[in-house]
From Swiss-Prot:
UniProt entry keywords in alphabetical sequence: Phosphoprotein
Protein name: Uncharacterized protein C2orf81 homolog
Keyword Phosphoprotein among record annotations: yes
InterPro entries, A to Z: DUF4639 (IPR028042)
Biased composition range(s): Basic and acidic residues: 1-23, 203-215, 347-356
Pfam families given in the database record: DUF4639
Region of interest (Disordered), ranges: 1-29, 149-227, 346-370, 450-475
This protein's record includes keyword Phosphoprotein: yes
Modified residues (Phosphoserine): S239, S243
């Protein structure tokens, strides 16, 4: 037994050493730093557990304090219930008693010293909105309609006028003109090529057909009869000064009054030019007018002196053509008019007529009626406002108009503006002419100066402080007893006659 004891101890030691040799080495757990070098993960977990413990303790303490305060408040309400009820009943009884009696309102004390009580400043004048409806009159341009033009509303009692205002002689030749005869004779009715029409007719054309039967004195001077032939004959009697100008001038101004006779469309200058002058006594002009249903815008006329046909153009005078174009011209004319007839029907209301801008001044036609004075100016302004006429250019004499190039009238006339409102705007009173009342000021936008009355205000003398508000009623200067006892007195004021009034 003694020998076994030390042997077992020796075996156990050997077994333990073998077991230690076989056990693998322990790997150290890596530490994660929350704050590098200062706070590790283990320390962070310890702090979190400690904080959670403190939160739990804080919640428990808050619950205990809330219970204690709630119990104390209930005890306070129980003690104050009776005194509060008594005070509320007393105030209610006093209010009911005041309702029984009318108490005098003494108002607020020290109103003048109170800065919140003061006069309001003068409100600024409202500015006019330029975009408001009716503030600014808007002008719209009327669209042009080819050769159509506004009828010039002249007096029906005036002398018949002739739509002739161009030159009958060649502008390039300097030698005197030979005697020749011009005759336009539409004996037969218009051919279908001239009156060819496709599609429905417009209301303006129907109105022109209705007014065609009433049109008289188209190319007549001092006569009103009608026949079926139109002939113009001019025989110069050797006078080198005879120069009659014919021109059919048209402008693209839109036609407004369709039923007006054509005899009132032409200006006084054309009639003055076509009337025989004293220095050209040998010249005579015979114009006989008969019923002409339609007149084309271009007419071919035989001219024996020029050796070829002559073209009547609405915007130019007589232009002699060479003989080699005499045969080609009629076919080209008919084909052109045929193409034009397919789109629009010829109408007397659309015939070219002189422009209002070529009307002469009163000194060129002393026998005609011309507006003069304030009434004439008012009538002219009324026509201009209605948009029916245009202002004639000033400073153009008859010689200046004759020297102008006739081809310039081919250019379109500037469009006429029509006003959308008939409201007349009066000019604003000048700030310098106004007499302001004491205490009233006005801002002058042109000079950027605040205008005020010449009389100084009393408030400025006393100071910038606002005047005190009277709390009591003002004392009357006259009592009712004085009014009842005093006799009635009347004073007659001298009558002042107005400077413009008649006696």
């Amino acid at each position: 037994m003694a020998h076994e004891g030390p042997r077992q101890v020796r075996d156990r030691g050997m077994t333990r050493s073998k077991a230690e040799k076989v056990r693998p080495p322990t790997v150290p757990v890596p530490q994660v730093d929350i704050v590098p070098g200062r706070l590790t993960e283990a320390e962070w977990i310890a702090f979190t557990a400690l904080e959670e413990g403190e939160d739990v303790v804080g919640d428990i303490l808050a619950d205990l304090v809330a219970r204690v305060i709630d119990s104390a408040f209930k005890v306070y309400l129980t003690q104050q219930c009776i005194p509060f009820t008594i005070s509320q009943a007393r105030e209610a009884m006093l209010q009911i008693t005041e309702w029984r009696f009318l108490a005098r309102d003494e108002g607020e004390s020290a109103v003048a010293e109170d800065p919140t009580w003061g006069e309001d400043e003068e409100p600024l004048a409202c500015t006019t909105d330029a975009w408001a409806q009716g503030s600014v009159p808007v002008l719209h341009a009327r669209a042009s309609m080819g050769l159509e033009e506004t009828f010039q509303g002249e007096d029906q009692d005036s002398v018949d006028q002739i739509p002739l205002g161009g030159s009958w002689k060649d502008s390039g030749s300097q030698e005197p003109m030979e005697s020749w005869e011009l005759t336009v004779t539409p004996d037969s009715p218009p051919t279908p090529e001239l009156l060819q029409e496709t599609g429905p007719r417009s209301p303006l054309e129907k109105l022109g057909d209705q007014s065609r039967s009433d049109q008289t004195d188209l190319f007549a001077v001092g006569s009103s009869n009608s026949s079926s032939q139109l002939s113009m004959e001019m025989v110069p009697a050797g006078s080198t000064h005879a120069s009659l100008e014919l021109s059919l001038v048209a402008s693209p101004q839109a036609s407004v009054e369709r039923a007006q006779p054509i005899s009132s469309q032409f200006s006084l200058e054309d009639l003055y030019n076509c009337t025989p002058q004293p220095h050209a006594a040998g010249d005579r002009l015979e114009l006989r007018e008969e019923k002409v249903p339609l007149i084309p815008s271009r007419v071919l006329v035989s001219d024996p002196s020029a050796g070829g046909p002559t073209t009547l153009n609405p915007s130019a005078g007589f232009q002699p053509q060479p003989p080699w174009l005499a045969e080609e011209r009629p076919s080209a004319l008919h084909s052109r008019i045929g193409r034009m007839g397919t789109t629009a029907r010829l109408d007397p209301a659309r015939l070219p007529r002189p422009d209002m801008a070529r009307s002469p001044s009163p000194k060129l036609w002393p026998g005609a009626k011309w507006p003069s004075g304030w009434e004439g100016e008012a009538e002219l302004l009324g026509e201009l406002w209605a948009g029916r006429t245009r202002v004639p250019p000033q400073g153009l004499d008859l010689g200046d108009r004759e020297s102008q190039d006739p081809h310039q009238y081919r250019h379109p006339v500037p469009q006429v503006l029509e006003a959308t409102s008939q409201v007349t705007w009066k000019p604003v009173l000048l700030p310098g002419a106004l007499k302001l009342a004491p205490g009233v000021s006005m801002w002058n936008p042109s000079t950027q100066v605040l205008l005020s009355s010449s009389e100084p205000q009393r408030n400025d003398r006393e100071g910038s402080a606002s005047p005190p508000i009277h709390t009591g009623a003002p004392k009357p200067q006259v009592t009712v007893a004085q009014l009842m006892n005093s006799a009635l007195k009347m004073w007659s004021l001298p009558s002042k006659r107005l400077p413009n009034s008649k006696p």
